[in-house]
Amino acid sequence: MSGAPQFALRPFLAEDAAVVAQIFRESIVALTGDDYGEAQQEAWASAADDVATFAKKLGGQLTLVATSDGEPVGFASLEGKDKIDMLYVHPDAAGQGAGATLAAALEKLAAARGAEKLTVDASDTARGFFERRGYVAQSRNSSSIGDEWLANTTLKKELKGATP
């Protein structure tokens, strides 16, 4: 077998909590350094320090896990029916299609749930990824995490096939 890796998707399970929290942290530390300082990265990654609380948040949303050879390599969550809350891929799997697979699945699920649009507050690192998928910038934002301020951009995509 050759070509790009194939990623399977499945629902988030409680036993995924530790590995998904690790993916979250490692993705932030390894992939966002060109856009955010070390203190900003540490503040951002601290959201997964309490694995139980992190798991509870993901368990309360529609959360999918991307796997390669049965091992989790990324995850994404849909808040409500029309907002991507999180989409993170392990640095070793970045750029191989796991993020695109997760985003496409959330877009289909949102449309199936009747959403006419999908929004995301994308980090400066992820903004280009979403723009290549047809998302359009709506506003620039600053949010505080502890003593740190992080910039992001709210983007929106009109969904085709949404049911009225």
Residue map of PLM features:
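Conserved active-site tyrosine of GNAT-family acetyltransferases
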Residues: 130-131, 135
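Conserved catalytic-core motifs of GNAT/GCN5-like acyltransferases
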Residues: 119-121, 136-154
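Acetyl-CoA-dependent GNAT
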Residues: 11-14, 22-94, 103-109, 113, ...
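Short secondary-structure capping/turn micro-motifs that flank functional sites
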Residues: 126-127, 146
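Residues at or immediately flanking beta-strands
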Residues: 8, 117-119
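Conserved N-terminal entry element of GNAT/NAT acetyltransferase domains
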Residues: 1-18, 160-164
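Glycine-rich phosphate-binding loop
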Residues: 97
